[in-house]
Amino acid sequence: MSINKILSSTYKITQRSNNNNILFNGLKINSFSLCNTKTNLFTNKTNINLYNNYSKSSKSGKKSKKDEDDEDGEIETSKTSKKSASSSSMENVLKELEKSFGKGTLMKLGSQFSTQKVEVIPSGSMGLDIALGVGGLPKGRVTEIFGPESSGKTTLALHVIAQAQKAGGNCTFIDAEHALNPQWAARLGVNLDELFVSQPDNGEQALEIVDSLLRSKTMSVIVVDSVAALVPRVEIEGEMGDSHLGVQARLMSQALRKLSPTLKDSNCVLIFINQIRMKIGVMFGNPEVTSGGNALKFFSSIRIDIRKVGTVKKGDDIIASQVKAKVVKNKLAPPFKEAIFDIDFQSGINKTGEIIDLAVAEGIIDKMGSWYSYNDIKLDQGREKTKYLLEKTQPNLLVEIENKLRDKLIKSKPLINQQQEEEGNDQTSDEFDIENDDEIIEEDIDDETIKK
């Protein structure tokens, strides 16, 4: 389109008598207006060109974005294909491993272990079970009990044996010290007729016996008393005064490396009782150290430091020792928890007294003055009379109170009570099924009569 047509169609040209008007194709046009018109025309043309360029660039931008989406889809497809290829190759690797080493060689942690509950055997002390965090000593793990002399190490181990026997398990006591007192074990509730005892000649023999028992998968608890008494064969066959540096530590390290895999499969509680020694020349820090090297410290899932902290008197006579058990290592719950309990010279750990004290502290048992009551049931006056009542007259009530404490404090119950409750739940569920069946039969009969 020419400028003449644009001007004639767009603007009304007025003739003016001044000198600014010029003649353009027979028309007088103001020169200033013409310049502005030309400028506007060029500006509009530039804007049109810019708009065309922008539209082209936007189209190309849309096209590039579409290309990017296609590229992202291709990347995701390639990732999916790579993932499927890696998963198929992983399945092939798993099949090869299972074919070479057996099923379960390589497993996913979440699918196999996250839902499994830790099986435990109660320690005989309610406070210690709470301090352990899982309700007792774990199965398939190594537990070390150490402390000074006459602090209750063997007594605690015998209580664990008594609890395991109540659940129907087999137990073995490796008496390397040759100092087991059967009468004291019987007072603690150990069934001597069902307890296996071994008194080995040397440390190698004792650990070989432990290995054989673990491989048999027939034991619930094995106690080795003690690590300090596991004398290596070379030391027994040598002369008095011969130096055998590190022989016992090497023996324990080798034995624990061998016992650990079989211990997990046996589902047994392996307890090592250990003594303490004093380091020479220690100026700062704790000079105490356990015998047998450091291997037992690393392989143990639970380490309990038990020490005598006081005595319990009745008149002028000392009737019990007060001990403090500290969980210095715990792989299953927070460590460094403590428990203080009494070891009676006649009956061992005073578990019923612990339950009464804890139940009063948690509000399960009400105490008004010197009288104790549970669920509006008046028990007795005084702690000792209440203890006697629960032990001799109301043992079922004692178990009920203990279970409430476990549910509230450690969310775990002893293996004995779990089995009893499972049997009771099976019976009650059967009864409910029978009642439901009767209701279904009655409904069927009603429907048939209605049809008739």
From Swiss-Prot:
ATP binds at G147, P148, E149, S150, S151, G152, K153, T154. Residues 420-452 have a biased composition (Acidic residues). Signal peptide: none annotated. It is found in: Mitochondrion. Gene3D superfamilies: P-loop containing nucleotide triphosphate hydrolases. Residues 53-90, 412-452 are annotated as: Disordered. GO terms for cellular component: mitochondrion. Keywords: ATP-binding, DNA damage, DNA recombination, DNA-binding, Mitochondrion, Nucleotide-binding. One of its GO terms (molecular function) is single-stranded DNA binding. Its main location: mitochondrion. One of its GO terms (biological process) is DNA repair. InterPro entries: AAA+_ATPase, DNA_recomb/repair_RecA, DNA_recomb/repair_RecA_CS, P-loop_NTPase, RecA-like_C, RecA-like_N, RecA_ATP-bd, RecA_C_sf. Involved in DNA recombination ability. Important for survival following exposure to DNA damaging agents. This is Mitochondrial DNA repair protein recA homolog. It comes from Dictyostelium discoideum (Social amoeba). The gene is recA.
